[in-house]
Structures are given as C-alpha cells and as structure tokens.
Amino acid sequence: MKKLLRLFFPLSLRVRFLLATAAVVLVLSLAYGMVALIGYSVSFDKTTFRLLRGESNLFYTLAKWENNKLHVELPENIDKQSPTMTLIYDENGQLLWAQRDVPWLMKMIQPDWLKSNGFHEIEADVNDTSLLLSGDHSIQQQLQEVREDDDDAEMTHSVAVNVYPATSRMPKLTIVVVDTIPVELKSSYMVWSWFIYVLSANLLLVIPLLWVAAWWSLRPIEALAKEVRELEEHNRELLNPATTRELTSLVRNLNRLLKSERERYDKYRTTLTDLTHSLKTPLAVLQSTLRSLRSEKMSVSDAEPVMLEQISRISQQIGYYLHRASMRGGTLLSRELHPVAPLLDNLTSALNKVYQRKGVNISLDISPEISFVGEQNDFVEVMGNVLDNACKYCLEFVEISARQTDEHLYIVVEDDGPGIPLSKREVIFDRGQRVDTLRPGQGVGLAVAREITEQYEGKIVAGESMLGGARMEVIFGRQHSAPKDE
C-alpha cells in the first residue's frame, strides 16, 4: 500500500512541483487552445456562410421567371464544376432548378431547412462525395487516400439556405448552396492537427524548462538538507542563517532548537560532573569510617550514625543535582532562611573525618545570628568545595569567619598552606584548571562554587591569608529575607 501511495504521491518536492506545474500548463493550454479553436470554427462557419450566400445572391440575380417557369442563364465563364452546387426551390419546397443532377444530395436537403435562412451541415460517405466531385482530380486523389485509411469515413458538407421574398417579377424562392468540397479536406480543418502538434511541442519544451525552474527554485531546500546532513555527521554546529526569506524563520527556529539542545546537553554533562565531585566528600567520610571500623578505632554504634548521615547526604546531593539539571534559566531562587553556624558545623565535622590522618584543625568564628537566605544545598555545595580545598592544601590550620549586611553574606576561609599565586587567582575558577597538579582532583569544585554564588549575584574572591596561605572570601548576594505577612 505504501509503495502505491509513493507511486501516486511522490515524496520529492521537485517531482511534485514538476507534475503540478505541468498539469496546470496542460490544462491551461487545452483550455486556451479549445477556446481559440471554437472561436476559429465559429468564425470559419460565418465566413463560409457569407461566401455561400454570395453564391446564392449571384444565382438569384441570374434567375428569370417567364411563363411560370424559372430560367437561369449562366455565363460562359461560370464553371458548372465549381466547388459549389446550387438548388432553387419554390415556396412549397418543390425543386425548380438544380445546377447539377445529384439525387442523393437532393434527398439530404431537409424540408424544414427551406422555411428560413440558415447554415447547416450534411454527412455523406466517401463514395457519394467522390461522385459529387468527379471532375476534380486533386480532390479525387485525397478522397482515395481517405478511403484507403477508412472506407466507412464520412465527409461533412456545408449548406447555406437563403429565402428571397416575392417581388413583382419573381415569386418567393429558396436558394440552397452546397459546398461540394468537404470540410475535412480543406486546409482550415488542419488547424486541429496543428493544435495537437503545438500542444505536444509546448509540453516537450515546457517540461524541461519546468525541471530547470524547479531545480533552481528548490536549491535553497537542497542546501538546507545538505546542512542538516552535516549536522548529523557533526561537521557543523548551526544552520546557515543566510537563506531565502521563506526559509529564514525555519532556519532561525531550528538554530534556536539546536542551541537549546546543546545547552541542555552541556548542562546535563556539567551537572553530572558536579554531582560526581560533590559525592567525593561523603564517600571519603564513609571510607574513613569503614577504615576506623576495620582497625577497631570506632565501634559499630559510633559508626552507624556517621554512615547514615553521609548516606543521607549522598541522597540529598543526588536529588539536588537532579533538580538543578531540570531547572531552566530565570528560575526563582528559594527564599528559605538557614542559620549558618549549624551548616558549617556539619561540614567541618565531615571534613575532620576525611582528613583525620592529616590532623587538620578547623576553627569557627560564626555568630549564631548570621543566616543564609536561599537553598540550603547551594550553601552546602559552595562551602563544602571551598572548605575541602582549604583542608586539602593547609598545613594544619583552617579558620572560618563570617559577617552579614542587609544584602550580602560574607564568609572568609583562611588556611596556612602554600597559598595561591597572584597570576592563578582567577584561573582556579575555570573548570579543569588547577594550580597544584600533583594532588588528586579534577579542578571542578571552585568552578561549581562560583557558578552557584553568581546565581545569588555574588562572587568568590581569592587572596592571601594572614596565616600565610590562601584566603577565600565567599560573598552571597540577594540576602534580604522575604517580607513577612502582616
């Protein structure tokens, strides 16, 4: 069934265009041709009638009525074998005079025709027509050719009837003039054959021109299809916007879709990378706890709450990053209020377990009144990455302090490590960029932290600590709390 549909409804736009246009051209050509032929035929009949009427007037002029009889005196220069034949009837339809004696033709004249002026046609077989034109050898040859092609062919003869009223010298007469040469043998009849030839030539010329027109008109679509194939083969990123006006909107919308899909893909990939990085700390805590259980430094009852807490943290992180992946640009941030001190206590407790062997000393100087306005997981993600870096690169001490204004929350993390060179203090926030390539890491944590703070119209500033190491100042904006309902 599908093959039949494809056969009758081609999928190619060029073939569709060619067939539709060819059909329109054919219909219009037939319509115009038929109108022209019908007009020509009507004009030809009128011309023939006028010529035959002229013959009728001539014979009426030559006719004389004497002793109740009609006499027609033909001059010597009028050939009795002329291409017309004249019959004259009285008002009762009785034949008064005949130019030639052709019985079969006289029988074909209908009595009703004789009552008024008119133009008529009679059908005769080839043999009868041949008898009517026995003296014309060229016509006889043409009739022979017709007879050889079709012995039963019929010839059409034109008949003009003219009624003349009675006068003082002439009674009422009806003159019938028959064109002895059939219409089929006249050169004017060839116009139908010419029409077929012209129509055929028209189609033979028009179809190639239509094909060229279709090829030229559909080139932009072919170019677009080629660009789509290049997109599929990853040889181009976007469609060329410089196209025809009709395709501009389509190309623009497709490019928007491509950009949106690419951004969404990049977002998912980035989110997956960030999730992997964020799970490092809870997994490290679990690993450290299991190591302590194995060495019997910690009992099962002590390890259980720690492990459950980290498992809960992993579950929260997965949910958090799935939520981030589904968020669209411009999504409103949460306006929840969270005390900063408890959040940092939980983070430092987890990091102490991770860096237990290193013996990191983390000190907090956080006022209980200081709060964070926003998504709790955002705060934990930012501070977790910053504190993890501080614990990783410090020698022993890490200090955390905080202050708050009406619009901003400032948290400062300092360590006594080697610090960050001045030339690297902006590079470290780029994904995949790390100052110390000897230590394990992917260079993702600080990039994630900065992206989140920028969502809060904040930033992270790297500097030099009074302890001799790095100083990271995390600034959260948009910290004005939501107005309370009165």
UniProtKB/Swiss-Prot annotation:
Binding site for Mg(2+): 385, 442
Record topological domains on the Cytoplasmic side: 1-16, 216-486
Gene it is expressed from: phoQ
Activity regulation field: Acetyl-CoA acts as a non-competitive inhibitor of the PhoQ autokinase activity. Feedback inhibited by MgrB, which seems to bind PhoQ, altering its activity and that of downstream effector PhoP.
Effect upon mutating residue 50 to D: Large decrease in the transcriptional activation of PhoQ-dependent genes
Effect of residue 68 to L: No significant effect (with or without MgCl(2) or CaCl(2))
One example GO MF annotation: ATP binding
Keyword Cytoplasm carried by entry: no
Bilayer-spanning residue ranges: 17-37, 195-215
Binding partners and assembly: Homodimer; probably dimerizes via the cytoplasmic domain. Probably interacts with MgrB in the periplasm, altering its activity and that of downstream effector PhoP.
Site feature: Plays a critical role in the switching between kinase and phosphatase states: 202
Protein name: Sensor protein PhoQ
Species assigned in the record: Escherichia coli (strain K12)
Reported induction: The phoP/phoQ operon is positively autoregulated by both PhoP and PhoQ in a Mg(2+)-dependent manner, inhibited at high Mg(2+) concentrations. Induced by dsbA disruption and dithiothreitol.
